[in-house]
Structure formats: structure tokens, C-alpha cells
């Protein structure tokens, strides 16, 4: 049984069609190109996940790539009938993939970044998408990263403010991070991330070295990984105030509560 899981990030692809100045991906591409082998998730793995992820779990179809680049996007989204379906996009392909998006997601988040030279173009694409979509799902959310004027975006939908941090990980935040009252990282308690190759991580933090990997769906079921020894060690360290004993967590400042 999978008990306590609330969110899963599924990386349909790690390919991207935008070069965001504050993205850690740029650093990896330049200094460690061998760590970033671009590609898409095999559709058979998507089919497997549709069967193994429990009902009513929130699925976010993104991680280190642009999900709208996935060739069989509409087919993939349609497989998950009993889960809450969301994704985060830069918006470039919203109009092109609109027939696969409308009524096939619950929410869609458009990331709007500080000092983006393509900002005005992005805004016009979003407006065109929304005019076609009308009142149908998905519900749009605009994730403003850094110092982004919010007025025009607020007219289009919900706003989620986010502060910037170091490109190489969840540290060096521009604002003080928010801690949960229970003092335990909510990501470790309730979250999983699955990359395009089927490697499962304990959270969705930027992790090019794979320090947070706790299982492989090519060898184990999602239930076995969730209840397995590696995740249990992550969880035990956090429950016992030993966050610093876990390699990925010892430099991370994020506690599962977004900072705006």
C-alpha cells in the first residue's frame, strides 16, 4: 500500500526549448554535459505509472524539461483518469498543443521569469491560448519568479509569487525561506519525483548528481520504492532532526513550503 503520498512529479521529457538565465540546467550543460542526456520518457513507462500512482494524488508532469515538448502529450495525460493533473510550462507551445491540453489537465502553471527578453511574446501567447480555451480546464496559474511586475498577469488568472535561489540548488534564496510548523520537510513526507528513465527521487529538488535517488521503476514497483529502505533512511533522518546527514538535504534550504 502507498500511504501518505500526495504529489508526484513525472518528467515526461528533460528536453527544453528555452534558455532561462537563472536555471541550473545551463550550468550543467556547460560544465557537466555528460550528466544531461536529453530524451523523453518511454510511453510504456508512462502507462505503468498511470496504473501505479494512487487515485487523487497530484501529478505534475514536469521536472527538468519542458513538458509540452513530449511527442505524445495528449495520450499521456489521458491515461491518468483518477489523479489531479497539473504541469508547469514556459508557454511557448501552448497554442500549438492546445488540443491536447484543453480538458486534459486540471491546472496549468506558466512560469514567468525576471528579466526575460521573451516576456512580452510569452504574454501574447498566453492571451491567445486563454481566448481559445475560454472557461474550459485547465485553470491557469502564473508563477512569477523573482522581480516580475504582476499587474497584467493578475488580470489573466491566479498569481503564485516565488523568490529566486541559486541555480545549482535550493539554497541562496533571495528571501528567508518558510519553514513548516512541524519542523519536518514536507517534500520528504509526501512527495516523489520520477525522471524520464524511471529513477525515483525522494523530492523534486535540482539534483544532477542523483543524490536523492531512492529507487528504479525498471526494477521495483512504486509501492516497493515508497516503502523501501532508502526512502525510510531519508525519512528517519528528517524525523530525528538529522537533515544534515542526508547528502542532498545537507545543503538544501527548502522545507516543502514555497517562498514568495
Please provide the spans of the model-predicted regions:
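N-terminal pre-core extensions flanking Radical SAM catalytic domains
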Residues: 1-37, 51, 204, 221-260
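Conserved alpha-helical substructure of the radical SAM core
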Residues: 1-107
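Conserved residues at the C-terminal ends of beta-strands
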Residues: 62, 111, 206
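A conserved catalytic-core signature of glycosyltransferases
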Residues: 63, 187-189, 221
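Conserved AdoMet/S-adenosylmethionine-binding subsite of the radical SAM
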Residues: 70-183, 187
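C-terminal accessory region of radical SAM enzymes
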Residues: 132-176, 205-256
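Short, acidic, Ser/Thr-enriched surface-loop or helix-capping motifs
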Residues: 194-195
Amino acid at each position: 500500500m502507498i500511504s501518505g503520498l500526495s504529489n508526484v512529479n513525472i518528467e515526461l521529457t528533460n528536453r527544453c526549448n528555452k534558455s532561462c538565465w537563472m536555471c541550473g540546467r545551463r550550468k550543467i550543460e556547460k560544465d557537466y554535459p555528460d550528466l544531461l542526456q536529453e530524451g523523453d520518457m518511454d510511453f510504456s513507462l508512462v502507462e505503468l505509472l498511470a496504473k501505479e500512482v494512487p487515485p487523487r494524488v497530484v501529478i505534475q508532469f514536469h521536472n527538468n524539461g519542458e513538458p509540452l515538448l513530449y511527442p505524445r502529450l495528449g495520450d499521456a495525460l489521458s491515461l491518468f483518469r483518477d489523479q489531479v493533473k497539473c504541469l508547469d510550462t514556459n508557454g511557448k507551445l501552448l497554442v500549438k498543443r492546445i488540443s491536447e491540453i484543453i480538458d486534459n489537465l486540471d491546472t496549468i502553471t506558466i512560469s514567468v521569469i525576471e528579466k526575460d527578453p521573451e516576456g512580452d511574446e510569452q504574454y501574447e501567447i498566453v492571451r491567445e491560448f486563454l481566448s481559445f480555451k475560454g472557461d474550459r480546464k485547465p485553470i491557469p496559474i502564473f508563477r512569477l519568479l523573482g522581480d516580475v511586475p504582476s499587474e497584467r498577469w493578475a488580470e489573466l488568472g491566479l498569481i503564485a509569487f516565488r523568490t529566486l535561489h541559486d541555480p545549482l540548488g535550493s539554497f541562496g534564496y533571495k528571501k528567508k525561506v518558510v519553514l513548516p510548523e512541524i519542523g519536518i520537510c514536507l517534500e520528504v513526507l509526501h512527495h516523489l519525483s520520477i525522471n524520464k528513465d524511471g529513477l525515483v527521487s525522494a523530492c523534486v529538488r535540482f539534483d544532477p548528481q542523483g543524490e536523492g535517488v531512492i529507487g528504479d521503476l525498471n526494477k521495483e514497483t512504486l509501492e516497493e520504492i515508497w516503502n523501501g529502505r532508502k526512502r525510510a533512511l531519508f525519512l528517519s533522518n528528517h524525523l530525528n532532526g538529522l537533515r544534515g546527514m542526508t547528502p542532498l538535504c545537507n545543503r538544501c534550504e527548502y522545507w516543502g513550503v514555497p517562498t514568495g
